[in-house]
Amino acid sequence: MHMDIVSLAWAALMVVFTFSLSLVVWGRSGL
């Protein structure tokens, strides 16, 4: 159960990081 929570937290963190990174790149490239 603990591993599931940790892996889920990591997955959520990666999703947020990837989303924010792509958003920054998209915004800087000239919307």
Curated annotation (Swiss-Prot):
It is found in: Plastid, Chloroplast thylakoid membrane. One of its GO terms (biological process) is photosynthesis. Keywords: Chloroplast, Electron transport, Membrane, Photosynthesis, Plastid, Thylakoid, Transmembrane, Transmembrane helix, Transport. Signal peptide: none annotated. Its main location: plastid. One of its GO terms (cellular component) is chloroplast thylakoid membrane. One of its GO terms (molecular function) is electron transporter, transferring electrons within cytochrome b6/f complex of photosystem II activity. It holds the Pfam family PetN. The chain crosses the membrane at residues 5-25. It is a single-pass membrane protein. InterPro entries: Cytochr_b6-f_cplx_su8_sf, Cytochrome_b6-f_cplx_su8. Belongs to the PetN family. Component of the cytochrome b6-f complex, which mediates electron transfer between photosystem II (PSII) and photosystem I (PSI), cyclic electron flow around PSI, and state transitions. The 4 large subunits of the cytochrome b6-f complex are cytochrome b6, subunit IV (17 kDa polypeptide, PetD), cytochrome f and the Rieske protein, while the 4 small subunits are PetG, PetL, PetM and PetN. The complex functions as a dimer. This is Cytochrome b6-f complex subunit 8.
